[in-house]
Amino acid sequence: MTQQTMSFQAEVKQLLHLMIHSLYSNKEIFLRELVSNASDAADKLRFEALENNALYESDPNLRIRLSFDKAARTITIDDNGIGMSRDEAIANLGTIARSGTKEFFSKLSGDQQKDAALIGQFGVGFYSGFIVADRITVETRRAGLPASEGVRWESAGEGDFQVDTIERAARGTTITLHLREGEDELLSSYRLKSIVQKYSDHVALPILMKKEEWDQEKGEMVEKDEDETINQASALWTRAKSEVTDEQYKQFYQHVAHDHQDPLAWTHNRVEGRSEYTQLLFVPSHAPFDLWNRDYRGGLKLYVKRVFIMDDAEQLLPQYLRFIKGVVDSSDLPLNVSREILQESRDVKAIREGVTKRALSMLEELANAEDDAGKEKYKTFWSAFGQVLKEGVGEDHANRERVAKLLRFASTHGDTDAQDVALADYVARMKPEQTKLYYVTADTWQAAKNSPHLEVFRKKGVEVLLLTDRVDEWMLSFLHEFDGKPLASVARGDLDLGALNDDEKKAQEETGEAMKPVVDKMKETLGEKVKDVRVTFRLTDSPSCLVADDNDMSGYLQRMLKAAGQSAPSFQPILEINPEHPLVKALKADGADFGDWCHLLFDQALLAEGGALEDPASFVKRTNALLLSRAA
């Protein structure tokens, strides 16, 4: 096929502009990204060769070679991995295939460190070569294709690229960067080695360069015809923990997670017994941009006897731990393992159980830290992944209690929206006569804090958890108790805050009896809007509030389901009125404006709990009429 000139996808043009103009001060990342791509190409070859050994083409020793040419002002990264066909070169180098391109650009912050990290996260690291090069030439041939089907891809990064078919004997990919003016400091063995050792020391493939020695006569370093390996070139997880420094763990995390920030914590151990495997797990310090996308692929890198099998092996972790990054290397799984086999394998189930327990232990260590730095780390973790962890209460019955101990909430104990109260903290502060853990759900912390349902709790000094995450109502349908004590909504059913003395009981019964004509008339007036109307003693400042019956769906959950486009049964609440409030005291069952007051009390209660009025215009009209009648 003759040479073709093709245009980059629009997003690639935008990306190239970003690379060249925005990331210059962090230019070293180009080598990190290209070495990472070469390592991935070797992993892919190993995987495909499991079923077709001929793909090695009598060259099974995989490596990456790095070289430079001062005269030509080029840097070359060469690998003997899987390589690319013509179609693959066009697809991989001319477009951003991954969904989420818009999210990528929306995430760019102008912070060069953060933006540089996103490049790897989105799989567009190849283009980082244009930070230092004004032209890139790629020569490649896919393993298994004839030498006549080699491909040359070339671009100056200005909107288009050329693709040509060439003769290429060796499989794999050779990338040549033609450096921009002013980049000659990169044409140094010492400089390139230092970048590799900084970013890619942990890559399990040997990275080779020609040895250099000092020539006394010439007074300069000269290249020898002998290779040297410039990185550690061993799978970090196979080494003993005592041989790995914290810095090496952090670098390895940044490699596997495509993240520029350090992890919050990690755990590394070998498991022996029914299943034999090594696990190296990390807790990131921030959530990936697409954590809540439907097509988000969580999971760990899976190796079998150090042979890469797949990225994102979701079967090794439950969904609620999808943010955990790392590697599992099994000694028992077959090398030809597929995603389907992973679903059914008994060995995988055992690994999943072990990995889950280890991940939870790591989080427990973070959560139980006594020092300020440790406490700060758990706060960081919770703000990034707390809502995801809450899913575990419903998803993981076996570990529900462990997950519950890791949960954090805002509460009336503090005066901020910080979610820093553990359920164990709440239990430790419970009143002697208190038998339940109380909570309120709302759309916002402000709405929860000011909920009329809290009035009597404040009066009696009883702490209430303020729950404002969308997942909370769903979670609570699985979390019925903690430490043997039931969880109770302050907006559901009859309220029992401890025994009343005889005088209090008698006074409440008398008040209820006196209010009966008003209550009955209100029930008749509001009709289908309410399930019941009753006198309450849970309010101190507000005239009314809405509560759900014990077995009914709450108004908050109904609103949440509707917002998600799901069908929800109609919310028929119980209207509770405060007999001590002046507005309620002034109600007369035979008054001309009684109906308007009934609807106003209902609408006010609905608004106070974050609900939406069915007919706002009538509410305004009714309110104005009542204000005018009072003013008159």
UniProtKB/Swiss-Prot annotation:
GO terms for molecular function: ATP binding; ATP hydrolysis activity; ATP-dependent protein folding chaperone; unfolded protein binding. Residues 560-632 are annotated as: C. Keywords: ATP-binding, Chaperone, Cytoplasm, Nucleotide-binding, Stress response. It holds the Pfam family HATPase_c_3. Residues 1-339 are annotated as: A. CDD domains: HATPase_Hsp90-like. One of its GO terms (cellular component) is cytoplasm. Residues 340-559 are annotated as: B. It is found in: Cytoplasm. Molecular chaperone. Has ATPase activity. Homodimer. Belongs to the heat shock protein 90 family. This is Chaperone protein HtpG. It comes from Burkholderia pseudomallei (strain 1106a). The gene is htpG.
